[in-house]
């Protein structure tokens, strides 16, 4: 009798244990959703605003891996975050449409214009997350004899000859030159270059290796706050815009996480994001009347005046032939 009783108890005990193990296995085997992107190229608040079902996987050494973003699409990826300069590297066939209808309806004119410039193949497969203006960063500006200090023309000051670190993007530099009236001769802007180095532009200026650099505001904010030798200029002619965007791989069955948007750009994060040099893809005109806790000197740079913001522009995607012509014009200058 005791033997039978023990047998029944053991059976029940092991049966319950087996059930618990099965349930535990199911819970732990559920794979987290994968967000991939380059660290520090987008606001970290974006990761924090996603649910705990998501995990961030950094993309490393993208400069030396030409197809890193496409490689990510072949891995387990549910969402991809990238800068607009990399969009053309993505195959449209590998992306699915991002509807997010209610959010798209609230996008600003700048965001809508940016998407239109991507063309029909991309505009519904790319979603703008944040935007940051390209600015001029100076080191010891007050000690430099600069001309036209509110304009891109300041780049042509003799004190900056061979002293500016430019982004390695002829397209962006040509767009600035054309804003100043240059058509096909870009030798003047080339003569001012110390280097064409996106990745190390900030280090060049901070270390004293260059007097100025052209870079996105979001990439130099921390140093600007800490280092009193640094200052920035948002030219009155406006500036190119650096967009941080999202893409959703076709192979992912996960719906686009629309709920994160209000959390990301809600009251908790808004001022923090702006102080990091990012602006929302929706209208921010009401923010000009609010205190965002930045120095008075930089208030109109972190939240540009409408007269300047209306002159800012995004770079549309170029066809293969247009890229070829642009390269020829740049190289022949």
Indicate where each model-derived feature is located.
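Extracellular/periplasmic juxtamembrane helices and adjacent flexible linkers that interface
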Residues: 255, 263-333
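Early extracytoplasmic/lumenal segment of secretory-pathway proteins
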Residues: 27-92
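Ligand-binding pocket segment of bilobal, Venus flytrap-like solute-binding proteins
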Residues: 84-90, 165-237
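Flexible hinge/capping segments at coil-to-helix
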Residues: 144-160
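N-terminal secretory signal peptides and thylakoid transit peptides that target proteins
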Residues: 1-19
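Ligand-binding "clamshell"
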Residues: 91-101, 118-124, 222-234
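A structural signal for short loop-to-beta-strand junctions that line the ligand-binding cleft
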Residues: 77-79, 97-135
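A bilobed periplasmic-binding-protein/Venus flytrap-type ligand-binding module shared by bacterial periplasmic
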Residues: 135-143, 241-257, 272-274, 282-283
């Amino acid at each position: 009798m005791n033997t039978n009783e023990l047998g029944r108890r053991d059976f029940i005990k092991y049966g319950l244990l087996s059930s618990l193990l099965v349930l535990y296995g199911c819970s732990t085997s559920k794979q987290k959703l994968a967000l991939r992107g380059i660290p520090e190229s987008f606001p970290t608040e974006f990761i924090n605003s996603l649910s705990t079902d998501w995990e961030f996987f950094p993309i490393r050494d993208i400069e030396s891996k030409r197809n890193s973003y496409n490689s990510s699409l072949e891995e387990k990826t549910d969402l991809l975050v990238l800068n607009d300069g990399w969009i053309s590297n993505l195959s449209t066939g590998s992306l699915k449409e991002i509807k997010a209808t209610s959010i798209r309806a609230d996008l600003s004119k700048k965001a809508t214009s940016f998407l239109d410039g991507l063309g029909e193949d991309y505009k519904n497969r790319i979603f703008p997350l944040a935007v940051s203006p390209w600015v001029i960063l100076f080191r010891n500006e007050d000690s430099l004899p600069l001309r036209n200090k509110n304009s891109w023309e300041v780049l042509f000051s003799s004190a900056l000859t061979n002293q500016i670190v430019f982004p390695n993007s002829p397209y962006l530099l040509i767009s600035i030159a054309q804003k100043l009236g240059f058509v096909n001769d870009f030798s003047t802007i080339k003569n001012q270059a110390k280097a064409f180095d996106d990745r190390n532009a900030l280090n060049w200026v901070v270390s004293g290796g260059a007097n100025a650099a052209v870079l996105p505001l979001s990439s130099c904010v921390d140093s600007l706050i800490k280092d009193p030798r640094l200052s920035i200029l948002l030219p009155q002619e406006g500036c190119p815009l650096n967009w941080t965007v999202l893409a959703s791989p076709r192979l992912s069955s996960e719906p686009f996480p629309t709920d994160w948007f209000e959390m990301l750009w809600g009251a908790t994060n808004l001022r923090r994001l702006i102080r990091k040099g990012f602006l929302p893809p929706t209208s921010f005109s009401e923010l000009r009347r609010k205190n965002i806790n930045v120095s008075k000197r930089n208030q109109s740079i972190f939240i540009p005046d409408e007269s300047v913001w209306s002159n800012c522009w995004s770079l549309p995607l170029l066809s293969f032939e247009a890229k070829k012509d642009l390269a020829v014009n740049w190289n022949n200058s």
